[in-house]
Design a protein with these regions (language model features):
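Domain-level detector of nuclease and nuclease-like folds
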Residues: 4-211
Length: 211
């Protein structure tokens, strides 16, 4: 278990627990045209063969990935929302090597977009709902209503929730976005529907720090 999870501490501001995993570009048409499917693309990212065929970043050896070139200012901002960045975990190196480097993304722009969107979600009705129900069992329908209040009813289908355990604990939230809107503040037009809502069922627990 990563030390940032094991050593997690309580915070009076519960939105602090809404953290970033990454920003993953979908399969580009130019790469799909070379016979690559979505599943292979999401597994290998920039290391996908025959293209882009860059060095593979391994999840078990994140710190072996090249440094990102992120500025000190950018790194400080990222560290506040991505607990696995820097330190002994090197999550930001892994994420950039797998999902960013083959697009030539400027590291400060790429990670800066993650930081900005994280703040926008935290300040939304959906973020406030998660914070206000910290440690509690909630209904999926109430979560969906908070998302709809934030960005409109059509945005609900963009949220895929992953849960583990019995009772079901919310462990991840994947949000599907339109690439053309990525540099704009989140709005009704930002979201793209996903085919599956996730495995969380009708209710789930919003976990809290500690065991």
């Amino acid at each position: 278990e990563p030390e940032e999870c094991r050593l997690q501490k309580e915070s009076s501001n519960k939105t602090d627990f809404l953290t970033v995993h990454g920003l993953w570009p979908a399969l580009p048409k130019s790469i799909a045209a070379r016979g690559v499917d979505e599943r292979r693309w999401m597994r290998f990212g920039c290391a996908t063969r025959p293209v882009p065929n860059m060095p593979e970043a391994k999840a078990s050896r994140k710190c072996d990935a090249a440094e990102t070139g992120l500025s000190l200012t950018g790194a400080a901002k990222l560290n506040s929302v991505m607990p696995g960045a820097g330190g002994n975990s090197c999550l930001e190196r892994y994420e950039y090597a797998k999902h960013g480097v083959c697009f030539g993304f400027d590291p400060d722009a790429y990670f800066g977009t993650m930081v900005r969107m994280n703040q926008e979600v935290k300040h939304s009705a959906a973020g406030k709902f998660l914070a206000e129900n910290y440690g509690k069992t909630v209904r999926r329908s109430d979560f969906d209503a908070a998302v709809a209040k934030s960005w409109g009813k059509q945005s609900v289908k963009a949220f895929k929730l992953t849960c583990h355990g019995n009772p079901a604990y919310l462990t991840e939230m994947q949000i599907s976005l339109n690439a053309s809107t990525i540099n704009n503040p989140l709005s009704a037009g930002s979201f793209a529907p996903q085919p599956h809502p996730g495995n969380c069922g009708k209710q789930f627990v919003i976990d809290k720090a500690g065991y």
